């Protein structure tokens, strides 16, 4: 493709055109300054390379180990799965690693499947078995790791439930819908209704329950979501602290969640509350002429906690920057009829955020964390 970069001076705007023919970093310079672009093979192609790498290299195979079937961190320098997390919970087989299962299930629901179907289905079934039998207790309390249990962390529940609901939609197996609702009920029992989860599965959860014919449970879950949404509306800009005192991944999930509950109910209180949060969210976005800092959230601490060497910038940008894209995307959907111009701008920003976050995927399918 051809990139067009605008350099704005006091007197004029200079547009530099650069044809991107190779993958990797591309510098576009003008009068002592420059923009940093990234050439990739293609958005979908890069995602599919990542999916194939996960299938080929990141599912643990050891029946004697409780982590058998888990998607785990891959050491790109050691060229192997990282089996020793060195006591660092951010490197274990639970927690954020659930995102690999969600990614695969979400891909399975897409229109085109280029990744091997038999291998794909088997991997997901093995992973679902691992999650239910090793990462959860019978009552759906959810662990952070399969060996010692780790911290009972509220964030884990929404991710596991999202995975189950996507599996229900993908396979038509009602048990996955039951597992999804069971996991969310466990979340509410233990953490109440005021926890600011990342990725409350509003849309996927309601759709999965409806598809499974679980209409009563669907209405119950919607009421649970509304109860949480009411608390978020009441709190407004007084965001509670969680693992970090104040951060993008508290605000962005709240905006996304309120927008999805608005879409499910039509109650404008929820959309109004989301609108009031947007300036706080936008204040945490970079707008620099670099693919690492354009529509990317400021998350310097995660570049330390998640990096291999625990040096600030190890992970740059951090993948949770993409939560803002989900928030912008849902907000754009909500205002599409009332303000098409603003909706188009938020959708553009959402897509830019996702594109730039794709720099965490390499052309051979590996990733930075």
PLM regions: where:
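Catalytic cores of extracellular degradative/oxidative enzymes
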Residues: 46-322, 329, 346, 353
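Acidic, mature catalytic/reactive cores of soluble proteins
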Residues: 26-27, 112, 355, 362
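Extended acidic/polar, glycine-enriched regions
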Residues: 1-48
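Compositionally biased, low-complexity repeat tracts
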Residues: 20, 28, 35-38, 65, ...
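Extended polysaccharide-engagement surfaces of secreted carbohydrate-active enzymes
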Residues: 313, 324-369
């Amino acid at each position: 493709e051809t990139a067009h970069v605008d350099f704005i001076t006091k007197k004029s705007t200079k547009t530099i055109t650069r044809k991107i023919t190779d993958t990797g970093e591309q510098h576009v310079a003008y009068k002592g300054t420059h923009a940093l672009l990234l050439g990739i093979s293609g958005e979908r192609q890069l995602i599919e390379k990542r999916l194939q790498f996960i299938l080929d290299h990141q599912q643990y195979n050891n029946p004697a180990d409780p982590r058998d079937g888990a998607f785990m961190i891959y050491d790109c320098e050691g060229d192997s799965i990282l089996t020793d997390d060195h006591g660092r919970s951010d490197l274990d087989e639970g927690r954020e690693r659930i995102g690999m299962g969600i990614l695969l299930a979400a891909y399975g629901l897409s229109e085109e499947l280029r990744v091997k179907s038999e291998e794909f289905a088997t991997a997901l079934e093995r992973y679902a078995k691992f999650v239910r039998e090793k990462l959860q207790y019978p009552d759906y309390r959810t662990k952070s790791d399969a060996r010692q249990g780790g911290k009972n962390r509220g964030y884990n529940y929404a991710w596991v439930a999202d995975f189950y609901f996507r599996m229900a939609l993908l396979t038509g197996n009602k048990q996955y819908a039951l597992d999804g609702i069971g996991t969310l009920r466990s979340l509410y029992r233990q953490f109440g209704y005021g926890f600011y989860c990342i990725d409350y599965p509003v849309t996927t959860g309601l759709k999965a329950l409806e598809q499974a014919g679980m209409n009563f449970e669907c209405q119950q879950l919607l009421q649970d979501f509304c109860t949480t949404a009411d608390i978020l509306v009441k709190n407004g800009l007084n965001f509670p602290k969680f693992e970090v005192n104040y951060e993008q991944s508290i605000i962005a999930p709240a905006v996304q969640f309120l927008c999805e509950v608005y879409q499910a109910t039509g109650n404008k209180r929820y959309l109004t509350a989301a609108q009031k949060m947007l300036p706080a969210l936008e204040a945490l976005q970079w707008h620099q002429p670099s693919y690492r800092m354009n529509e990317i959230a400021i998350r310097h601490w995660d570049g330390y906690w998640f990096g291999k060497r625990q040096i600030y910038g190890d992970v740059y940008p951090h993948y949770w920057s993409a939560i803002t894209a989900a928030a912008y995307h849902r907000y754009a959907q909500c205002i599409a009829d009332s303000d098409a111009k603003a909706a188009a701008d938020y959708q553009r920003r959402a897509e830019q955020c996702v594109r730039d976050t794709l720099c965490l995927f390499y052309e051979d399918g590996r990733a930075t964390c």
